[in-house]
Amino acid sequence: MPPFAHRAGLVTEAERSQTRDALSEGGAFEARPWGGFRTLEEGSGYKVKRLVVEPGHRLSLQRHRFRAEHWVVIAGSPRVIVGGRARRLKPKATVTVPRGAWHRIENPGKVPVVIIEVQHGPYLGEDDIIRRQDDYGRTSERTERG
């Protein structure tokens, strides 16, 4: 597929499906309203995930008390917000999200965004999320461990 195809509206549903199929390797896929993720590996103090953000969707504006994250864009062109700074990224771009920083991943494009996320910290549970804003009604004053 030419690199401009998604911007020109030339991406077919079959091509989108092939992209999702190519990403289906690894552990169990955990669906979320925005797409979902697979945990690829985890150990003491770290976890590696493959995130897929579907076109037109975005994650919560959120932060974590116990972990920092490092993102590598694999596919798509996400808009990310970290610490109040928004920017558009391309494949191979990297982002560091410090512990406690408000952050979000958005997919304004026509193809799925794929990001490899490396989490590190003393606690990596899915309940270490404090949401400020969420498109899917999951906003809460305080959803955190401890």
Task: Please provide the spans of the model-predicted regions.
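Double-stranded beta-helix
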Residues: 2-31, 104, 108-146
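A short glycine-rich, His/Asp/Glu-containing loop-to-beta-strand
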Residues: 25-68
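Short beta-strand segments
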Residues: 59, 85-87, 128
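Short, charged beta-turn/beta-strand-edge "cap" motif at the junction between a beta-strand
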Residues: 65, 101-104
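Glycine- and acidic-residue-biased ligand/ion/polar-headgroup-sensing regions
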Residues: 66-79, 83-84
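Short acidic-glycine-tyrosine-enriched beta hairpin
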Residues: 84-102
